[in-house]
């Protein structure tokens, strides 16, 4: 038991009396504490005044007021800190929300477990079984990430409904025969160039053109597709320029290559291309080396091919690499006499003459690799047919998969520029 010595000073009239004696500590109930606190909120009352009236320390009464304002009546009775009612309500609300989310995710998890049994092929296959087993449409659409409106359409279809996209059964026999005919003559052609040749033949016959995707599907089903090309590592040297131009007779490019005949004889070919329509303007083949005279012959043949006996009205760029036959003074002087402006690529930059480099790869892959070349004379004759086939029939991706001369005729018949013809 705690014994307190209380000192009271009573003022009676003008005499002051000190009262000294033992006094027990008074324990107040919760109701008494609340009454004292409420009295401190009355008008004209202060914490200090009410505390003196009831013999309570002002700090203790201030603590009771704080606990009372926070709604912690239990704290007033127990004399210890508890969570305020506002925080308790927020915590209870959060607990209810977490319980709702937990139940929602549990249902979604159960739905997805059942959907795995049905939806290994396509998601729409799992719709009907799941909804038939009692799952809601909204829950199914949200879990499977499909359109809710489309689910409603599927559920309301009649029993005799048929998918019009799958009701057409086309006969691919004739198309397959034509594909075999094309790749029989040109085995290095992929489905895009096969489609281009079939499209051209259909235009000549006045028949509807075949879709490229259909050609791809037929060739894939019959194992006629070419092997995918291996990924080429990117070059460390960035090439930001553009070799191709939008109009013909603005820039020509030239390069050379060689190949070996079956008897060991080597032929060296020099050619010139237009950097817009990709037509092989002129070419020359020899068993000797690449020299200035051969390049001059190719220059003259290219000018005669495009301008006849006249010279170009404006200079045409003559783009080549840094070979000695192209940098010779005689070659450059002769080029300027013909109205050509010699341009050389940067050192060790084959990309700067990429059109000519690509042409070399095309000729070697699609023609030289499959044509008979027992000796130099036979190879030269077959090479002439290869250049003619390239100009007249070989589809080029940059020309909308049309051949160079087909591209030129298409633009001339429609009265369009080369740039607009390419868009068509």
Swiss-Prot record:
Taxonomic lineage of the native organism: Bacteria, Pseudomonadati, Pseudomonadota, Gammaproteobacteria, Enterobacterales
Name of the protein in its database record: Insertion element IS2A uncharacterized 48.2 kDa protein
Positions of the Integrase catalytic domain: 229-412
GO BP: DNA integration; DNA transposition
Gene3D superfamilies, per the entry: Ribonuclease H-like superfamily/Ribonuclease H
Regions crossing the membrane: none
Record-level Gene Ontology MF annotations: DNA binding; transposase activity
Signal peptide: none
UniProt-listed InterPro entries: Homeodomain-like_sf, HTH-like_dom, Integrase_cat-core, RNaseH-like_sf, RNaseH_sf, Transpos_IS3, Transposase_8
Listed Pfam families: HTH_21, HTH_Tnp_1, rve
Coiled coil in keyword set: no
Keyword annotations: Transposable element
Record family assignment: Belongs to the transposase 8 family.
Domain of life where this protein originates: Bacteria
């Amino acid at each position: 038991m705690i014994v307190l010595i209380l000192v009271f000073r009573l003022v009676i009239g003008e005499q002051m009396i000190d009262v000294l004696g033992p006094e027990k500590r008074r324990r107040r109930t919760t109701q008494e504490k609340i009454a004292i606190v409420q009295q401190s909120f009355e008008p004209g009352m202060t914490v200090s005044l009410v505390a003196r009236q009831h013999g309570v320390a002002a700090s203790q009464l201030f603590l009771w007021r704080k606990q009372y304002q926070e709604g912690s009546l239990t704290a007033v009775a127990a004399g210890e800190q508890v969570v305020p009612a506002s925080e308790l309500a927020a915590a209870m609300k959060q607990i209810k929300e977490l319980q709702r989310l937990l139940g929602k995710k549990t249902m979604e998890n159960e739905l997805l477990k059942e959907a795995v049994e049905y939806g290994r092929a396509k998601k729409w296959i799992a719709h009907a079984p799941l909804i038939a087993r009692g799952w809601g449409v909204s829950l199914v659409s949200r879990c499977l990430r499909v359109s809710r409106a489309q689910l409603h359409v599927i559920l309301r279809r009649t029993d005799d409904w048929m998918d019009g996209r799958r009701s057409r059964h086309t006969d691919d026999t004739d198309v397959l025969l034509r594909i075999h005919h094309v790749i029989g003559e040109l085995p290095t052609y992929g489905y895009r160039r096969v489609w281009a040749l079939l499209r051209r033949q259909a235009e000549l016959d006045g028949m509807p053109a075949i879709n490229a995707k259909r050609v791809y599907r037929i060739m894939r089903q019959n194992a006629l597709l070419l092997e995918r090309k291996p990924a080429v590592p990117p070059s460390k040297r960035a090439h930001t320029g553009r070799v191709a131009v939008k109009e013909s007779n603005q820039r020509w490019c030239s390069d050379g290559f060689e190949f070996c005949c079956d008897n060991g004889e080597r032929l060296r070919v020099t050619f010139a291309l237009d950097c817009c329509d990709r037509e092989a303007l002129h070419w020359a083949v020899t068993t000797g080396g690449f020299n200035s005279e051969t390049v001059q012959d190719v220059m003259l043949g290219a000018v005669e091919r495009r301008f006849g006996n006249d010279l170009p009205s404006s200079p045409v760029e003559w783009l080549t690499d840094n070979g000695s036959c192209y940098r010779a003074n005689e070659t450059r002087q002769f080029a300027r006499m013909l109205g050509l402006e010699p341009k050389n690529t940067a050192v060790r930059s084959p990309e700067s003459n990429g059109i000519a480099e690509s042409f070399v790869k095309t000729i070697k892959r699609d023609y030289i690799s499959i044509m008979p070349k027992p000796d130099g004379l036979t190879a030269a004759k077959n090479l002439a047919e290869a250049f003619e086939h390239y100009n007249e029939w070989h589809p080029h991706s940059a020309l909308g998969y049309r051949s160079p001369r087909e591209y030129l005729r298409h633009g001339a018949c429609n009265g369009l520029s080369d740039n607009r013809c390419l868009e068509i």
